[in-house]
């Protein structure tokens, strides 16, 4: 045992011993655990610590498995027990017995025997029970078997000099009254929510809320279980942390704010170990872990661990190092209660007339505009997806409740499409479009009745007929894009002239997003294949064979012209978009995010200022939904915020490629290299899609069915016939 400088003994402090026990799990410094360790359990055979009358006691403490002293401490009546060493090799199974110390005075605890105090000037003892006597030498405390139910009174401390016995008794009575008041304050403090630190919430077996089972102090926190409960259930693992100091009564700080000079120790999160923000679902937890637990329970998530459930959730690790399966398992084992989670409330709610006018874009276009009702078999991508019939379209951008903002930014693949989330709405529209493609491009009759498979499992076919392929790309796909917009409830309030401007911008952008993505997912980057939405691919390694077998006979171009026209565009798309998609390994949800960003672009050329503000508000909500999606679904990544930025930066490359794609389309149309189609021409020419006040097309427009009808309530209150098309300014031939 290392040498210790013995402090000078002074006046004895009255004291009593409270014995409890706890189980420590890891190394903890003595000073941070407690200021009073009085004895060891019966499993130890080394010397124990005791309180003697004005005599310093030096002892050591060893575990039951090893006789090597691991703790050295000294006791003086002046300052109580002060540790001079540290725990260097504390085993997990070591049980310690603690005494409660408040400041510089040992206070009595419930169920503890009284130890009278004395000094060199004390009076001789009398027969009265309340008389101050010299403290006898105490034997080492016996092992804890049971705790008495009533505490013995604490005798007054210090030297009392009286001549008259009555005065002495009166003085002793005053001391006892002060001690009782002090005990009441102590009990109020140790059972206050501010000092207990809610350790009972961390215990898997609930402790009875009575004095002899649990105790805290203003400077240190101790936890204990009685022997009867120990025999019926294993002892809990308690975290020994410093209790919060109570603010002074004279403090002018607000409730819940520590006074100046108060030191408040923040309890650790029971899941990851970082600083907690309070009690969440029954345990001390940080905001991130509590939000994760709430999302998992509300969305009924089912995670799996790639390491067999052996991951470690630590506070110093980044979000990407937290396995969601192990993190949720630790939430449950720490005591988080699923029943405490409040599930989502009504997502629609009711708004006042003022809020409706503020949110509704119709107030800017047409005050009397009516809102149509969309009736569609809305689906989800999962096998359990149902239908949502007769969903009323909102009059404007709905306010998404905060409870939904933290949960709806997930993939939304297993929930209904009736929820108010911009990202969720886009995902539902993309899922419905995928099912429509299954019907149009099915290779056999059985495919009409099958659920759409994943992209990797789709069967590709090589180009055999250019005319059939162009029919798919320039007759079916533009109509699917229009249906994608028409079914989007967030765009329903817009007048038809504004929808057409958005559509002409979106239909080209959409092709520039999907084709590089499909090419990458089907391995086209390595094979130099160009994959189209109709599951047809062109092999750019051998374009000549398509001229030899007559697949491109309807193109009216020779081999050299075709190569010079399309090969640079393909190479540019794969280098600037496809390779970046491959590098980030983007998901189908992120593909939908890109489609939403190009659809809700407030910078579209020629749109009305009211439309621009309207699109900006929807896009801002989409960005918020995307942020929540990355916080939840992409939390396993090392830097999800960087990935989110990389996805957003793809929009610039998509816009550049869409310009090249538009130029190719104009060239094919102007030189009559593809079969004529009225809707295809209207899609590229603004003059052919402008709407006159009476609802008819302009006289110079080509004849043919309009891709969308013009309802009376959706025309808007202004005309903008002079606006050029969004692509005309870039592709003027």
Swiss-Prot record:
Identify the SUPFAM superfamilies for this entry. Glucocorticoid receptor-like (DNA-binding domain), Nuclear receptor ligand-binding domain
Q: Name one GO biological process term.
A: negative regulation of transcription by RNA polymerase II
Please tell me where this protein is predominantly located.
nucleus
Point out the DNA-binding stretch(es).
Answer: 266-343
Cellular compartment(s):
Nucleus
List the InterPro entries: HNF4-like_DBD, NHR-like_dom_sf, Nucl_hrmn_rcpt_lig-bd, Znf_hrmn_rcpt, Znf_NHR/GATA
Q: Where are the zinc fingers (NR C4-type)?
A: 269-289, 305-326
Region (AF-2) location: 676-687
Keyword check for Transcription regulation: yes
GO CC terms on record?
nucleus
The record's account of tissue expression is: Widely expressed, including in hypodermis, gut, muscle, and neuronal cells of the ventral nerve cord, head, and tail ganglia. Expressed in the head ganglion in several sensory and interneurons, including AVA.
PROSITE patterns listed in its UniProt record: NR_LBD (PS51843), NUCLEAR_REC_DBD_1 (PS00031), NUCLEAR_REC_DBD_2 (PS51030)
Top-level division of the source organism's lineage: Eukaryota
**Segments forming domain NR LBD:** 444-687
Q: Which UniProt keywords apply?
A: DNA-binding, Metal-binding, Nucleus, Receptor, Transcription, Transcription regulation, Zinc, Zinc-finger
Q: Where is this region: Disordered?
A: 113-190, 361-396, 691-733
Record-level Gene Ontology MF annotations: DNA-binding transcription repressor activity, RNA polymerase II-specific; RNA polymerase II cis-regulatory region sequence-specific DNA binding; RNA polymerase II transcription regulatory region sequence-specific DNA binding; zinc ion binding
* Record text on subunit structure and interactions: Interacts with nuclear hormone receptor nhr-49; the interaction is direct.
Could you say which protein family the record assigns here?
Belongs to the nuclear hormone receptor family.
The free-text function statement in the UniProt record for this protein reads: Transcription factor. Binds to regulatory elements and regulates transcription of target genes, including the potassium channel accessory subunit mps-2. Negatively regulates transcription of mps-2, thereby modulating age-dependent memory decline. In concert with nuclear hormone receptor nhr-49, involved in regulating target genes with roles in sphingolipid breakdown and lipid remodeling. Plays a role in modulating mitochondrial morphology and function.
**Entry's PANTHER family?**
NUCLEAR HORMONE RECEPTOR FAMILY MEMBER NHR-66, NUCLEAR HORMONE RECEPTOR FAMILY MEMBER NHR-86-RELATED
Protein name according to UniProt: Nuclear hormone receptor family member nhr-66
What is the organism of origin for this protein? Caenorhabditis elegans
Q: Which gene holds the coding sequence for this protein?
A: nhr-66
């Amino acid at each position: 045992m290392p040498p210790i400088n013995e402090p000078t003994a002074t006046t004895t402090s009255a004291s009593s011993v409270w014995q409890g026990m706890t189980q420590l799990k890891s190394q903890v410094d003595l000073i941070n655990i407690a200021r009073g360790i009085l004895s060891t359990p019966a499993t130890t055979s080394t010397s124990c610590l005791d309180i003697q009358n004005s005599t310093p006691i030096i002892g050591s403490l060893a575990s039951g498995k090893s006789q090597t002293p691991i703790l050295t401490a000294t006791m003086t009546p002046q300052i109580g027990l002060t540790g001079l060493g540290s725990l260097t090799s504390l085993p997990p199974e070591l049980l310690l017995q603690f005494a409660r110390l408040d400041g510089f005075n040992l206070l009595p605890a419930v169920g503890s025997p009284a130890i009278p105090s004395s000094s060199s000037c004390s009076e001789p003892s009398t027969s009265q029970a309340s008389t101050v006597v010299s403290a006898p030498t105490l034997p080492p405390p016996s092992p804890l078997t049971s705790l008495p139910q009533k505490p013995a009174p604490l005798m007054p401390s210090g030297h009392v000099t009286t001549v008259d016995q009555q005065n002495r008794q009166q003085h002793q009575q005053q001391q006892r009254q002060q001690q009782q008041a002090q005990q009441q304050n102590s009990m109020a403090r140790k059972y206050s929510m501010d000092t207990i630190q809610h350790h009972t919430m961390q215990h898997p077996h609930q402790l009875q809320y009575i004095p002899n089972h649990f105790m805290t102090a203003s400077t240190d926190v101790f936890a204990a279980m009685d022997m009867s409960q120990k025999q019926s259930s294993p002892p809990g693992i308690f975290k020994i942390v410093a209790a919060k100091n109570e603010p002074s009564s004279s403090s002018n700080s607000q409730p819940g704010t520590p006074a100046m000079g108060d030191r408040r120790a923040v309890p650790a999160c029971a899941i990851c170990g970082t600083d907690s923000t309070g009690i969440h679902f029954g345990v001390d937890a940080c905001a991130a872990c509590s939000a994760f637990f709430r999302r998992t329970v509300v969305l009924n998530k089912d995670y799996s661990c790639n390491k067999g459930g052996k991951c470690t959730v630590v506070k110093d690790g980044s979000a990407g190092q937290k396995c969601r399966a192990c993190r949720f398992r630790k939430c449950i084992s720490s005591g988080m209660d699923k029943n405490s989670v409040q599930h989502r409330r009504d997502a629609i709610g009711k708004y006042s007339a003022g809020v409706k006018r503020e949110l509704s874009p119709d107030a800017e276009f047409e005050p009397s505009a009516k809102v149509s009702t969309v009736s569609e078999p809305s689906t989800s991508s999962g096998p359990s997806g149902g239908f949502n019939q007769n969903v009323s379209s909102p009059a404007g951008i709905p306010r998404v409740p905060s409870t939904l903002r933290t949960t709806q930014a997930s993939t939304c693949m297993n929930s209904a499409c009736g929820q108010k989330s911009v990202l969720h709405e886009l995902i539902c529209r993309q899922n419905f479009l995928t099912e429509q493609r299954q019907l149009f491009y099915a290779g056999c009759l059985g495919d009409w009745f099958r659920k759409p498979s994943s992209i990797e499992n789709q069967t590709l076919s090589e180009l055999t007929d250019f005319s059939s392929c162009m029919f798919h790309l320039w007759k079916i796909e533009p109509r699917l894009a229009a249906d994608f917009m028409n079914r989007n409830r967030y765009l329903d309030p817009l007048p038809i002239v504004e929808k057409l401007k958005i559509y002409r911008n979106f239909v080209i952008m959409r092709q520039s997003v999907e084709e590089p993505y499909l090419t990458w997912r089907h391995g086209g980057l390595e094979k130099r294949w160009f994959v189209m939405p109709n599951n047809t691919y062109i092999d750019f390694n051998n374009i000549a064979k398509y001229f030899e077998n007559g697949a491109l006979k309807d193109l009216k171009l020779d081999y050299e012209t075709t190569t010079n026209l399309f090969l640079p565009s393909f190479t540019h798309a794969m280098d600037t978009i496809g390779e970046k998609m491959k590098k980030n390994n983007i998901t189908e949800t992120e593909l939908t995010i890109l489609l939403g960003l190009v659809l809700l672009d407030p910078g579209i050329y020629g749109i009305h200022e009211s439309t621009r503000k309207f699109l900006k508000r929807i896009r801002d909500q989409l960005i918020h939904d995307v942020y929540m999606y990355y916080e939840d679904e992409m939390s396993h990544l090392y830097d999800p915020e960087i990935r989110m930025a990389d996805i957003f930066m793809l929009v610039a490359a998509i816009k550049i490629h869409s310009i090249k794609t538009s130029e190719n389309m104009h060239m094919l149309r102007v030189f009559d290299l593809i079969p004529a189609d009225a809707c295809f021409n209207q899609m590229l020419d603004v003059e052919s899609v402008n709407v006159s006040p009476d609802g008819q097309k302009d006289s110079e427009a080509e004849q043919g069915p309009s891709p969308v009808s013009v309802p009376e309530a959706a025309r808007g209150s202004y005309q903008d016939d002079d606006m050029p098309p969004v692509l005309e300014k870039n592709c003027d031939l």
